[in-house]
């Protein structure tokens, strides 16, 4: 054929059925191709039925008639019909140009004429818009929502003609259809010329929106294309001069000319609609012919509807706006062959639903709207073939067919690009426009169509191993029925997707490509067959390089394509080809096996949730992986089998067997999932166990066993150490879980017959326990079993299933013979009660035939024969019972000489007659069964004793250096659920067994190499089993209780976490103890041996020497009191110690009152620097000669205090130092263990000294005395702090408390604990409602905390709005309480206002201490803190126990600074000069005065909340902000401004916080003045400027009004109104380019709204006065200074407006008056709103300005003045008209 070399077009069949001049594939109104092809052969019209594959009907026109065009025109009954445009120069039918409608009679090959109509001009194209079937019923016509005059027609067709004529027509029915004479009706009233509105005389005026136009002679323009946009009912008319007319057939009755972008012929127009477009756009593609300078081109046009406007559904599609989205020139394209939409059905179920307005209509030919998918179009064109170097360049050029598919959905996914671009790969594909190459010659090709009537006509390439973008290109689509209509034949072809094309090429040329894969690998990746980011070519993204494997990445990419896409035959041929070396074959086998094993683990990863009971069904991705794995395993198995035969390698044969095991496992797993065997049903599993137990007991009674029991025993002998046994004895293993059952299929040591019998029996038991129907016949069981296992799975068939059922029946059936023998045996003797003895046998009570079985008789005969023959043959030793029976057998056969002396002596007769035979052999007496049983029991007793001794030892041991030695596992965390040797949370039970394998097996398990598998090894089966087994991390059984506890509930409180490998005894002891054991004490009086191991000394548990703790990783040892110690232990303490310590507390308080230290916080030391008065501490140090005692002795941790979390880096150094100190002390004396335990919580009643119960050391008592001192001091401080305040005590439950260690030798620890205690002291004070100045400090707190994170819109607005309402509703009592000076014992803690104290906690529950607060929690607490205090009393506030984060701590420090300053200013007369202010954020050795630069830096970074109240300032201002309006701020605003500037500090790398002691009020005032001066000198930042602008009294709506005034919209002015009887009516004269319009009385004047044209509609009649009243009146010529705005909807519905309210032709003067009036109104509204804003600003702050908007908004007056200046400048500028659309 002519397309044999084509790679995309695949020819199926050709039909040489005719010779013709033109072929047309019929399409319905929306472009769906139908299975009919029309052929024009001179004056004969033929119809080829594709389904019948022959010409079925024809019609012969009169001689000399020329057939122009044809279209689909069904009858009212839905029968096939066509519409034909005919030219008859002889006028044999009475007309030269006419249109006929032909209908098909199923019983006759001839067609009949049903309708006809004469046309005035020569026909060029015909198009059926709405057929008789579409409009047969009145209800159907109503659904179409057409113009009311068109609704009366039986059908609507469009006829394009020469001389610029396009008609909407209704054909006239023929009275006698069967008449041989053609009757052509001439009814001009049924013809409506759409182009008359734009034709004046013999000139076509193509006018655009901007009023520019071009004139063309009508004789040179004709209609070249017709198409219907179904959603908006718009007819698109393509003109030969490049223009396009859009005529709306809906009730809007409007026409418009689209933008003229070229002057070339519009060949075809194809409507498109994207899938589920929310914007309701409608698209169409217009194909443009070539010119001498340009190739052919496509244009993508978009029609926009009024979806964003509030209009009715019927008006939504009125007057759409069209624009070009994409233009693309097809290089070397010569002419268009076919442009056909690809229309498919979205869902067949949607065809039955009732269609509404969106669907337009419902009939046999059209499915508008949601049922049809019209997102693609086929573009077929002729292209000049490229000349190859070997061809003759002077030869005639050859033209071939080339096609492209445009997908608008893919264009959407690429974010509607404006040009066609490639993806940058080797194939150079476009994401939404795919080119199809072919070698089909284009000389006689007339049309190409794609049928999509059946579901299999269109398919997309799918891949289970790749999700590349190329798989969603149009090139990934395959079309099965593509018909190419030629002049001489019809070819049925297939368009194949590019992926299949590349796969076929790789398969055919695989032997050559495997040696040179560089080029093809890049093509494979460019087609998306594998992912680009996988260099190794594996789709699992986990395939590592195999050791000593020489395969390149390009070869792996090629092999992946062959293996994963199922090219089995081509891949297996490589094993038998002689041109491929054996080395390469082995490497390919190793690679294939590696891919199979790796993909098996991928499948296990996706099924693990189902096996573990965490999900009930597989995901779609997992289902695809299972299906792909089954195919992959078959390909690999076939290659390994072929390669083993070619290379004669047994190892490869064994590996092939392992691959088939993986395939059986995967396939059976899929079947179990499909039949709901997986996931496990616990109830059904229990039923299976009960059924098996019942059957086993029945078989035991029958002295037999079940067949499945023998199968399990054989499995145990073949694979005793397999992981599927799950440490269960084999006789109790059945029925297993599905996981264990399927796992045995992966074991290559077990034969296939055993696997088959086991699986079949399991499936039978599962079916038998069905809750729906438990009674099944044997046939039903067999059929259901074969249905689940599928035929040939493990070579199973119905015959083998029946055999297994029969064997099970026999085991459960009891025979009469066996019952009799059993009864006789029980009568003679019972093995359970007595044993066999010589006395019973000599008594003749038991005959030998009953006592000795047949098998034993045969064995005894052989033994007797061997014994009688004599010689050196050594007889085997029998067990005692068999020996007795054998002696009886010899006695019965009278072989007395062979009997033993024991048997002879037991028989009186024999001992009398044969006394010499008693001691003839020197063998001693053998042990009886009783003796052996006693010996075994004694051994077991001793073994149990040793085991019990081992169990008394500690459960968790420290790690040992020898890793190969295995220690006894710990039972603390369950049997096999977890292990102490793994860092992960869960280690499967088989992990330890896996670790026992050698390095070769470990390398296989770790995906590192499989060379060890193919190497010679005696344990090959074990290694293969290890390789293909389910990974241990997925081998976890289903546990419902564990799943509920882990997945839906909180973890158990007494469940300790798993412990990793321990490297010290201390960690072992901490991790191993349970949560309910309480405090552990060890006696030190028992010494530990030097060489004793931990196992030997483990049971003592009394002597642990902690001096051996030298590990650097030891945790910090801290003090913790036990809750279990009650008050009865506390009362035993002596009162003398309590009194002494109270005196020490008072002395220490007096010393601390004289000296104030600066202490560390948990922040970095460089973050904060606090000014303090150091004269008093220095004097105290000088007098005493020593430093001030640490503050930790004075302050103690309270149970209701909030403890901040410590920094990890800081604590790591602290732990190391503490450990070092304890080690040094341990050399001299024993100390307490210091283990801090999370389950021991200290209560309030535990605050006194607690004696040690089990240890009497003096050292430990000393350490507890220190604790008692701390407790007493804490109680003293708490009582002193609460005495001056007359508030109620907080009633709370005792809260847990963690006692911090007391190590006075370490300075860092001093600061750590003192900082904690200071924080607690400040939080102990009762809440004080802030005054105005303190309110400002709270604002500063909010600002500082808020600035720690990027501000969001919510925090910026809410924080400012809420801060203004915190001073409202103040109680006078609270104000008086604020002015009360704090007492001495409070130590100025009442000044600080913590955000955590202001929060209320209704429940008083203890939150988690270890979880730091999130950012949202911190921000929300800061924003709401000020407003929550408003209506609450101090005694109602309850402290919250969540520890503050780092941001909260820094914010509290900042708030303390601001609060201290405000108190200093307001309480100067009442404050004592000796008061000291405690610092919370400065280290002991850091005291610095901030310079001016630091102050400037601090004030520069002000927060948004602060910058809002700061307006533009003058250098003389005293710090108060003044808005632009001149309004004086209120006192609260002024105070807020000044205090905010004084206290506004932010956190940076080295931020400085000023803290002034009480005697330095003058210094503080000077400092505040310096800050104000520094702030005035620096330039205003963006936030400051925006805040000052925001305070102006400008209504925000005024700027919007002004912008609306400036914005004008043009009215589309090229829609025409046409009279229904408009044959002789002339068109209005339109002014030429650049000239004003002539004022003619006969022609309507063009208004400024239309910009040079009159509004045009399809219909205009004198009878329709209401329709004409909707069009605007005669207006003046257009001026570009229009400012009024009229929408299309206002023009269309203008009849609803009263005549006296209409404004005719508003001139420039009137427009100015209107604008002035509007501006006055807007100014008045602005003033009224501004005045209300002024009143409101006294109560609340202005909204925070948004980031980046620093420019002040203009007022309405300024906007109006600017608009006037712009209009004057525009009026002075001349109007430039162009054929192209004006750029707005």
From Swiss-Prot:
Where are the stretches annotated Important for nuclear localization? 846-1071, 1601-1784
- State which tissues express it: Ubiquitously expressed (at protein level).
Per the record, its GO cellular-component terms are: kinetochore; nuclear envelope; nuclear inner membrane; nuclear pore; nucleoplasm
Where are the stretches annotated Chromatin binding?
1239-1601
Q: Does the keyword Nucleus apply?
A: yes
Keyword set includes Disulfide bond: no
TM ranges: none
Q: Which stretches does UniProt call biased (Polar residues)?
A: 1352-1366, 1383-1398, 1445-1459, 1581-1606, 1716-1735
Biased amino acid composition, Acidic residues = 1222-1232, 1266-1278, 1321-1336, 1566-1576
An example of a GO molecular function for this protein is: molecular adaptor activity
Q: Where is the composition biased (Basic and acidic residues)?
A: 1126-1149, 1279-1293, 1337-1351, 1367-1382, 1428-1444
Top-rank taxon of the source lineage equals Eukaryota
Q: Where is this region: Required for nuclear envelope and kinetochore localization?
A: 1-956
Knockout phenotype, as recorded, reads: RNAi-mediated knockdown results in embryonic lethality. Impairs assembly of the nuclear pore complex, the integrity of the nuclear envelope and distribution of the integral nuclear envelope proteins lmn-1, lem-2 and emr-1 and the nuclear pore complex proteins npp-9, npp-10 and npp-1. Reduces the recruitment of npp-10 and npp-5 to chromatin.
Provide the residue span(s) of the region labelled Required for chromosome segregation, nuclear growth, nucleoplasmic accumulation and cell cycle timing, but not required for nuclear envelope and kinetochore localization.
1630-1784
Listed A to Z, the keywords are: Cell cycle, Cell division, Centromere, Chromosome, DNA-binding, Kinetochore, Meiosis, Membrane, Mitosis, mRNA transport, Nuclear pore complex, Nucleus, Protein transport, Translocation, Transport
In residue numbers, the region (Required for association with mitotic chromosomes) covers: 566-778
Q: Where is region (Disordered) located?
A: 945-994, 1115-1784
Residue ranges for the DNA-binding region feature of this UniProt entry: 1630-1642, 1746-1758
According to its UniProt record, where is this protein located? Nucleus; Nucleus, Nucleoplasm; Nucleus envelope; Nucleus inner membrane
Composition bias (Low complexity) maps to 1297-1306, 1533-1546
GO BP term, pick one: cell division
> What does it do?
Nuclear envelope protein which has essential roles in assembly of nuclear pore complexes and in chromatin maintenance during the cell cycle. Appears to be a stable structural component of the nuclear envelope during interphase. In dividing cells, localizes to kinetochores during early stages of mitosis and then to chromatin during late mitosis. Important for several mitotic processes including chromosome condensation, kinetochore assembly, chromosome segregation and cell-cycle timing.
In Swiss-Prot or TrEMBL terms, this protein is called Protein mel-28
């Amino acid at each position: 054929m002519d397309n044999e070399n084509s790679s995309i077009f695949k020819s199926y069949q050709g039909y040489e059925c005719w010779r013709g001049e033109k072929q047309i594939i019929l399409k319905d109104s929306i472009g769906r191709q139908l299975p009919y092809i029309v052929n024009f052969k001179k004056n004969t019209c033929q119809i080829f039925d594709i389904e019948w594959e022959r010409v079925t009907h024809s019609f012969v026109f009169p001689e000399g008639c020329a057939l122009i065009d044809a279209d689909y025109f069904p009858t009212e009954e839905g029968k096939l019909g066509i519409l034909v445009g005919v030219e008859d120069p002889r006028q044999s039918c009475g007309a030269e140009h006419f249109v006929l409608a032909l209908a098909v009679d199923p019983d006759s090959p001839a067609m009949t004429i049903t309708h006809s109509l004469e046309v005035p001009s020569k026909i060029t194209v015909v198009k059926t818009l709405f057929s008789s079937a579409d409009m047969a019923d009145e209800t159907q016509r109503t659904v179409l929502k057409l113009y009311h005059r068109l609704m009366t027609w039986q059908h609507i067709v469009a006829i394009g003609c020469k001389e610029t004529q396009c008609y909407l027509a209704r054909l006239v029915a023929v009275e006698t259809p069967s008449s041989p004479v053609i009757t052509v009706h001439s009814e001009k009233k049924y013809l409506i010329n759409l182009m008359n509105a734009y034709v004046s005389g013999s000139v076509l005026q193509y006018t655009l929106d901007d009023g520019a136009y071009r004139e063309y002679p009508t004789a040179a323009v004709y209609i070249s294309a017709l198409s219907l946009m179904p959603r908006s009912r718009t007819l698109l008319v393509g003109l030969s001069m490049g223009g396009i007319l859009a005529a709306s057939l809906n009730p809007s009755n409007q026409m418009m000319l689209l933008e003229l972008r070229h002057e070339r012929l519009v060949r075809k127009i194809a409507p498109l609609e994207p899938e589920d477009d929310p914007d309701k756009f409608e698209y169409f593609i217009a194909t443009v012919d070539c010119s001498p300078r340009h190739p052919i081109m496509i244009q993508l046009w978009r029609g926009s509807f009024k979806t964003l406007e509030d209009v009715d559904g019927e008006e939504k599609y009125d007057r759409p706006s069209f624009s070009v989205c994409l233009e693309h020139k097809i290089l070397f394209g010569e002419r268009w062959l076919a442009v056909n939409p690809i229309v498919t059905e979205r869902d067949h179920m949607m065809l039955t639903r009732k269609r509404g307005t969106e669907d337009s209509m419902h009939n046999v030919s059209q499915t508008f709207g949601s049922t049809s998918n019209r997102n693609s179009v086929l573009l077929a064109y002729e292209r000049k073939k490229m000349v190859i170097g070997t061809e003759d360049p002077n030869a005639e050029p050859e033209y071939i067919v080339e096609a492209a598919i445009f997908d608008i959905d893919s264009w959407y996914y690429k974010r509607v690009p404006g040009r066609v671009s490639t993806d940058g790969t080797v194939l150079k594909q476009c994401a939404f426009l795919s080119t199809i190459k072919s070698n089909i010659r284009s000389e006689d090709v007339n049309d190409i169509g794609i049928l999509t009537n059946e579901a299999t006509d269109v398919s997309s390439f799918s891949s289970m191993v790749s999700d590349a973008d190329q798989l969603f290109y149009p090139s990934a689509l395959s079309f099965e029925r593509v018909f190419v209509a030629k002049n001489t034949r019809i070819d049925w072809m297939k368009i194949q997707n590019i992926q299949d094309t590349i796969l076929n090429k790789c398969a055919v040329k695989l032997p050559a490509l495997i040696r040179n894969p560089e080029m093809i690998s890049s093509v494979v990746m460019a087609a998306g067959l594998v992912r680009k980011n996988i260099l190794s070519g594996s789709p699992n993204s986990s395939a590592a390089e195999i050791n000593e494997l020489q395969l390149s990445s390009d070869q792996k990419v090629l092999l992946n394509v062959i293996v994963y896409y199922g090219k089995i035959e081509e891949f297996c041929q490589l094993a038998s080809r002689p041109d491929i070396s054996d080395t390469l074959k082995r490497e390919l086998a190793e690679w294939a096996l590696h891919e199979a094993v790796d993909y098996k683990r991928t499948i296990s990863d996706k099924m693990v949730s189902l096996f573990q009971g965490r999900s009930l069904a597989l995901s779609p991705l997992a289902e695809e992986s299972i299906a792909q794995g089954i195919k992959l395993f078959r390909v690999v198995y076939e290659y390994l089998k072929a390669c083993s035969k070619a290379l004669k390698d047994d190892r490869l044969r064994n590996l092939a067997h392992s691959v088939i095991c993986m395939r059986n496992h995967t396939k059976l797993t899929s079947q179990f999932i499909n039949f709901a065997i997986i996931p496990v049903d616990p109830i059904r599993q229990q039923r299976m166990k009960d059924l098996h137990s019942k059957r086993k007991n029945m078989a035991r009674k029958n002295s037999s066993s079940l067949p499945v029991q023998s199968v399990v025993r054989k499995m145990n002998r073949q694979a005793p150490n397999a992981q599927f046994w799950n440490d269960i004895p084999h006789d109790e293993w059945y029925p297993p879980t599905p996981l264990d059952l399927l796992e045995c299929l992966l074991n290559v040591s077990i034969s296939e017959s055993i696997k088959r019998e086991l699986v079949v029996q399991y499936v039978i038991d599962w079916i038998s326990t069905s809750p729906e129907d438990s009674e099944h016949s044997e046939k039903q069981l067999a059929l259901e079993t074969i249905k689940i296992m599928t035929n040939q799975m493990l070579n199973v068939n119905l015959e083998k299933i029946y055999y297994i059922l029969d064997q099970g029946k026999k085991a459960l059936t009891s025979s009469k013979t066996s019952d009799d023998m059993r009864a006789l045996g029980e009568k003679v003797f019972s093995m359970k009660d007595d044993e066999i003895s010589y006395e019973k046998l000599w008594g003749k009570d038991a005959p030998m035939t009953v006592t000795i079985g047949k098998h034993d008789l045969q064995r005894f005969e052989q033994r007797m024969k061997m014994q009688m023959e004599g010689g050196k043959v050594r007889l085997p030793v029998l067990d005692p019972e068999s020996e007795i029976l054998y002696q009886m057998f010899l006695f019965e056969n009278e072989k007395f000489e062979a009997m033993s002396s024991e048997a002879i002596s037991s028989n009186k007769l024999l001992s009398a007659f044969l006394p010499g035979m008693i001691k003839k052999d020197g063998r001693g007496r053998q042990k009886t069964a009783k003796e052996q049983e006693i010996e075994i029991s004694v051994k077991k007793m001793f073994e149990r004793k040793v085991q019990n001794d081992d169990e008394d030892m500690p459960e968790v041991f420290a790690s040992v250096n020898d890793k190969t030695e295995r220690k006894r596992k710990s039972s603390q965390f369950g049997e096999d659920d977890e292990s102490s040797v793994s860092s992960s949370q869960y280690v499967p039970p088989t992990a330890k067994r896996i670790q026992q394998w050698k390095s070769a097996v470990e390398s296989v398990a770790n995906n590192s190499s499989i060379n060890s598998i193919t190497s010679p090894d005696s344990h090959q089966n074990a290694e293969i089993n290890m390789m293909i087994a389910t990974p241990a991390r997925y081998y976890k059984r289903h546990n419902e209780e564990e799943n509920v506890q882990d997945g839906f509930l909180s973890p158990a409180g007494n469940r300790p976490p798993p412990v990793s490998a321990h490297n010290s005894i201390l960690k072992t002891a901490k991790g191993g103890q349970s949560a309910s054991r309480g405090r552990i004490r060890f006696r030190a009086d028992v010494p530990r041996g030097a060489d004793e191991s931990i196992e030997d000394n483990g049971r003592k548990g009394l002597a642990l020497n902690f001096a051996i703790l030298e590990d650097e990783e030891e945790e910090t040892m801290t003090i913790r009191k036990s809750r279990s110690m009650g008050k009865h232990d506390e009362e035993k303490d002596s009162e003398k110690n309590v009194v002494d310590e109270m005196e020490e507390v008072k002395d220490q308080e007096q010393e601390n009152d004289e000296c104030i230290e600066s202490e560390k916080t948990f922040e970095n030391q460089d973050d904060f620097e606090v000014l303090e008065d150091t004269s008093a501490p220095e004097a105290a140090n000088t007098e005493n000669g020593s430093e001030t005692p640490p503050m930790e002795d004075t302050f103690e941790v309270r149970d209701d205090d909030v403890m901040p979390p410590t920094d990890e880096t800081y604590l790591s150094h602290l732990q190391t130092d503490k450990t070092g100190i304890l080690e040094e002390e341990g050399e001299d004396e024993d100390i307490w263990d210091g283990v801090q335990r999370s389950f021991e919580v200290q209560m309030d009643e535990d605050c006194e000294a607690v004696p040690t119960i089990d240890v009497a050391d003096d050292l430990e008592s000393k350490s507890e005395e220190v604790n008692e001192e701390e407790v007493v001091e804490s109680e003293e401080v708490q009582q002193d702090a609460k005495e001056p305040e007359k508030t109620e005590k907080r009633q709370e439950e005792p809260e847990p408390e963690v006692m911090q260690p007391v190590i006075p030798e370490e300075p860092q620890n001093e600061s750590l604990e003192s900082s904690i205690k200071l924080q607690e002291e400040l939080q102990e004070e009762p809440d004080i409602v802030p005054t105005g100045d303190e309110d400002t400090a709270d604002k500063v707190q909010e600002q500082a905390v808020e600035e720690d994170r990027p501000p969001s819109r919510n925090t910026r607005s809410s924080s400012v709005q809420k801060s203004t309402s915190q001073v409202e509703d103040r109680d006078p009592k609270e104000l008086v309480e604020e002015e009360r000076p704090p007492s001495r014992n409070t130590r100025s803690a009442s000044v600080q206002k913590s955000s955590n104290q202001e929060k209320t906690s209704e429940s008083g529950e203890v939150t988690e201490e270890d979880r730091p607060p999130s950012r949202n929690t911190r921000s929300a607490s800061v924003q709401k803190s000020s407003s929550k205090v408003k209506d609450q009393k101090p005694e109602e506030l309850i402290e919250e126990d969540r520890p503050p984060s780092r941001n909260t701590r820094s914010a509290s420090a900042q708030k303390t600074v601001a609060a201290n300053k405000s108190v200093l200013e307001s309480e100067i007369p009442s404050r004592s000069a000796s008061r000291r202010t405690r610092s919370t954020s400065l280290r002991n050795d850091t005291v610095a005065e901030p310079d001016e630069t630091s102050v400037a830096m601090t004030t520069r970074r002000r927060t948004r909340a602060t910058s809002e109240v700061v307006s533009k300032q003058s250098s003389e201002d005293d710090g108060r902000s003044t808005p632009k309006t001149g309004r004086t701020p209120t006192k609260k605003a002024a105070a807020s401004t000044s205090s905010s500037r004084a206290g506004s500090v932010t956190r940076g790398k080295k931020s400085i916080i000023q803290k002034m002691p009480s005697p330095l009020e003058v210094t503080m005032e000077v400092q505040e003045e310096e800050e104000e001066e520094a702030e005035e000198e620096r330039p205003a930042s963006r936030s400051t400027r925006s805040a000052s602008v925001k305070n102006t009294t400008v209504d925000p709506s005024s700027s919007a009004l002004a912008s609306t005034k400036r914005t004008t919209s043009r009215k589309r002015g090229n829609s025409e109104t046409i009279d229904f009887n408009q044959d002789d009516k002339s068109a209005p004269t339109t002014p030429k380019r650049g000239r004003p319009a002539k004022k003619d009385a006969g022609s309507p004047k063009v208004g400024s709204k239309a910009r040079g044209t009159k509004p045009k509609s399809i219909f205009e009649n004198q009878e329709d006065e209401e329709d004409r009243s909707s069009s605007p009146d005669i207006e003046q010529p257009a001026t570009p200074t229009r400012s009024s705005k009229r929408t299309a909807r206002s023009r269309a519905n203008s009849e609803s407006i009263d005549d006296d309210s209409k404004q005719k032709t508003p001139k420039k003067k009137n427009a100015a008056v209107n604008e002035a009036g509007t501006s006055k109104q807007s100014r008045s509204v602005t003033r009224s709103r501004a005045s209300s804003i002024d009143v409101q600003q006294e109560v609340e702050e202005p909204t925070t300005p948004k980031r980046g908007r620093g420019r002040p908004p203009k007022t309405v007056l300024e906007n109006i003045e600017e608009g006037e200046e712009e209009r004057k400048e525009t009026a002075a500028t001349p109007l430039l008209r162009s054929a192209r659309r004006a750029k707005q």
